[in-house]
């Protein structure tokens, strides 16, 4: 199946799928342009580089509130944990940095950031064991996978019920794998990408799907218990991740998972044209 792409000679104009002028193609040119845009984004630019926290910032003292200080980049904390004896402190710093940059709202759970850090620390008490956990391929039925452990339901603040942090779990593992050079790479589960992915599946894989194929839908959970709700999220992410993997294979890996994520996210958020 051939994919028709409308290409522009202008390096600052995206290539698009023919007949879909709002759907950027998954090309090397588009990836290079979007990655340049990412590096101009004040939030993400700081996080993808080694940027230490503000003077006086301590992740253990500023778990839920930075007090107006910069909490440090996730790249900083992951690199530091390979050389600093205070592994737990660096792990907590990384949790806070990923949560802050991606607005995944761990603090909507009771003691969310600290609790999630403790969950990771329990199964990966040092950087070597963390890399080992990151190297495990994701399987939605593996209850000991790091994504599964992190995304278990936690008590939500101010209301009855649990909150599942699947977006944070996948993003933490993706950031950690990149920074620590793990062999396995995780996709980041994202609302914007999950909205657009069915259309990319149709174009690149010739697999038509309903618009909500890769969405976590509240109405489907009405009769589920807490364990089933957690498994449902893992299953949706498993399909989402597998779709991305097959699309990348289809285009001969001319871009990677992060670049696909960025092309879709920035284009569909309206930040680039």
Task: Report the location of each language-model feature.
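Short alpha-helix boundary/capping elements
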Residues: 42, 100, 176-180, 268
